[in-house]
């Protein structure tokens, strides 16, 4: 049977990553906190994939709103990785473009996949885990630019359901030339 699905090199591994157990715990830093005894707010610092896994037990279906600002995959240098492209050789190996004898199985004229696959594999497990935290009427807001918006929309449709999409809010960042 044929089915419609959005897939990429590394998708199966990203599902495994989302479900991989973690052996860490969150530790409160009371001395660094403001009004620790009076506030109900949490500031959590750490790898966001690990933190999302840790929050599953205490906050499953309890979060009303999530805001994320993932890397935009622009290739620029930031504190975090913002360049999720594979080399052409890495992409050919992982996509099955060649058989075990080195024969080309198909001609991939669209090399775009190698620039987007790693980014999709980075965001997918995080969105799967974020979905588990949301209440039935919870919402997620995601900041993104034009580099990955189409892929993000497809992943969100899969993870959250197409019918749950509300809107895209565009922000004008600079005047166009002309």
Language-model regions, residue ranges each:
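DnaQ-like (DEDDh/DEDDy) 3′-5′ exonuclease domain used for proofreading
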Residues: 1-67, 72-125
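Conserved Class I SAM-dependent methyltransferase catalytic core
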Residues: 106-170
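Flexible, glycine-/basic-rich loop-and-beta segments that form/coincide
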Residues: 177-178
């Amino acid at each position: 049977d044929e089915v419609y699905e959005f897939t990429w090199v590394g998708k199966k591994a990203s599902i495994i990553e989302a479900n991989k157990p973690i052996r860490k715990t969150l530790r409160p830093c009371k001395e660094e906190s403001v009004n620790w005894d009076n506030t109900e707010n949490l500031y959590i610092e750490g790898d966001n994939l690990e933190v999302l896994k840790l929050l599953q037990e205490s906050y499953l279906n309890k979060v009303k709103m999530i805001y994320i600002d993932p890397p935009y995959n622009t290739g620029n240098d930031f504190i975090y990785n913002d360049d999720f492209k594979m080399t052409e050789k890495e992409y050919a190996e992982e996509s099955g473009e060649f058989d075990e004898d080195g024969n080309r199985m198909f001609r991939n004229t669209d090399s775009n996949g190698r620039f987007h696959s790693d980014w999709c594999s980075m965001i997918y497990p995080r969105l799967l885990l974020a979905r588990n935290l949301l209440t039935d009427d919870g919402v997620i807001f995601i900041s993104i630019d034009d580099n990955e918006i189409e892929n993000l929309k497809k992943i969100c449709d899969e993870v959250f359901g197409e019918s749950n999409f509300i809107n895209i809010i565009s922000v004008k960042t600079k005047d166009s030339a002309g």
